[in-house]
A protein has these predicted regions:
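Extracellular glycan-modifying ectodomains
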Residues: 1-158
């Protein structure tokens, strides 16, 4: 809904302003990941029983409307923050873009693998726990030289 997106924009504006004004390190912000409910939303009996990744060699699979709009907000607010910080070397602001790659991994949700009590939700198609998606996010993050340099300097100070 429009109210949700407006709230998301305000949150990202506030976070970016705070980082630019008060933070002097490396900030890695993760883009929105995609849920994979089939049939209905989570609270109306939607399920996510996928056990294999999607195959999209041409990159033509479209993002659902809501994650696409959230991603635009995240990207725009990060760009505005980079302009706002100007020539300052700190903070270093990075966006770990997992939005499209998470779309391709409906098999990474715990829903079909969970053992749950009768009081717990029956499907979890939003959170990530299975090997694959999270490992790929880590590889993306640590392939960035700024992240590697920050980690190396932390290790050398201990």
């Amino acid at each position: 809904s429009i109210e949700f997106l407006h709230g998301m924009k305000l949150v990202w504006e506030t976070i970016m302003k705070h980082l630019v004004d008060h933070y002097k390190g490396l900030a890695i912000l993760r883009s929105v990941s995609v849920s994979h409910f089939d049939g209905n939303p989570w609270d109306k009996g939607g399920t996510c029983k996928k056990t294999q990744p999607y195959f999209d060699p041409d990159g033509k699979m479209e993002l659902p409307w809501t994650p696409n709009e959230i991603f635009k907000i995240q990207n725009n607010e990060l760009r505005k923050a980079i302009v706002l910080k100007g020539n300052a070397s700190k903070p270093i602001l990075k966006l770990l873009d997992v939005t499209y790659s998470s779309l391709l991994r409906p098999d990474g949700h715990p829903g079909v693998y969970r053992i749950q009590s009768s009081t717990e939700p029956k499907n979890d198609c939003v959170h990530w726990c299975m090997p694959g998606p999270i490992d790929m996010w880590n590889q993306l993050m640590f392939s960035d030289p700024d992240v590697m340099c920050m980690n190396m300097s932390k290790d050398s100070n201990s």
